A protein has these predicted regions:
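Phosphopantetheinylated carrier protein domains
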Residues: 39-67
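N-terminal sensory regulatory modules of PAS/LOV and PAS-like folds
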Residues: 24, 33, 63
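N-terminal helix-turn-helix DNA-binding core of bacterial DNA-binding proteins
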Residues: 30-36
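Short polybasic/polar patches that bind polyanions
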Residues: 18, 34, 52
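Thiotemplate assembly-line natural product biosynthesis machinery
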Residues: 1-25, 74-82
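Residue-level recognition of oxygen-bearing side chains
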Residues: 32, 68-71
Length: 82
């Protein structure tokens, strides 16, 4: 079953908040991913977890390519299989 915008963005916010040692409420969907200062290996691991949760393949660099949580979520929504 496809996930909603709120489900996907919430999942990403929770993971980034955890690893960046922030409260989820401190993270906005339009903040550039690079501002969270998470290393590329960690972001690849988050992407791998996200792939498993979504049941779809993602580019290991999707967060860097899309730039923000909001843009990443939009891309996922547009590319989920119906």
């Amino acid at each position: 079953m496809n996930k909603t915008y709120t489900e996907i963005s919430g999942w990403i916010v929770e993971r980034i908040a955890h690893h960046a040692e922030l409260e989820p409420r401190q993270i906005t969907l339009d903040t550039e991913i690079v501002n969270f200062r998470l290393d590329s290996l960690l972001m690849v691991n988050i992407t791998s977890e996200l792939e498993e949760w979504l049941g779809m393949d993602l580019s290991p660099s999707i967060f860097w390519e899309m730039g923000t949580i909001g843009a990443t979520t939009e891309w996922i929504l547009e590319n989920q299989e119906a």
